[in-house]
């Protein structure tokens, strides 16, 4: 299986003392580095994971997010089974050529996955470059 590593950026340079440093985790590990949290943010991950890994991420979020907490997922997503732009369609083709398990995820499938793990879809926010932030609550 692929292993992805993320290089922690210089969080200390942001001068946000009330914001904890990001945690490194592997969604395939059933033990996450925290037991419960109020907020989970993941950026540009769902399209580079296999679908089973996306399912594991949502299962982990469902186990870890406290009642009233929020899960925000940033990235390029298909809307209702369709690409939202030609550039997203081309990006999806590039990803799938590299690894057929990668690719843009459909928002309907992600919303259904959230429901399976006790998450209520709350909102979506358009972002630059045909990306969106999808927001769930526990």
Where do the language-model regions lie?
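Short alpha-helix
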Residues: 100-118
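A short beta-strand submotif of the Rossmann-like class I SAM-dependent methyltransferase core
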Residues: 39-46, 51-54
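Conserved beta-strand signature within the Rossmann-like core of class I S-adenosyl-L-methionine
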Residues: 67-80
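Core SAM-dependent methyltransferase catalytic element
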Residues: 117-138
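Class I SAM-dependent methyltransferase SAM/SAH-binding core
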Residues: 1-31
């Amino acid at each position: 299986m692929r292993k992805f590593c993320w290089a922690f950026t210089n969080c200390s340079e942001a001068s946000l003392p009330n914001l904890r440093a990001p945690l490194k985790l592997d969604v395939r590990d059933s033990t996450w580095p925290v037991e419960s949290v109020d907020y989970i943010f993941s950026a540009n991950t769902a399209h580079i994971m296999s679908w089973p890994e996306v399912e594991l991420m949502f299962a982990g979020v469902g186990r870890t997010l406290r009642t009233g907490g929020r899960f925000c997922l940033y990235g390029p997503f298909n809307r209702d089974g369709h690409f939202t732009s030609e550039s997203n369609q081309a990006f999806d083709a590039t990803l799938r050529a590299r690894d057929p398990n990668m690719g843009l995820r459909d928002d309907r499938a992600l919303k259904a996955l959230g429901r399976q793990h006790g998450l209520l879809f709350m909102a979506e926010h358009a972002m630059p470059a045909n990306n969106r932030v999808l927001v769930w609550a526990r």
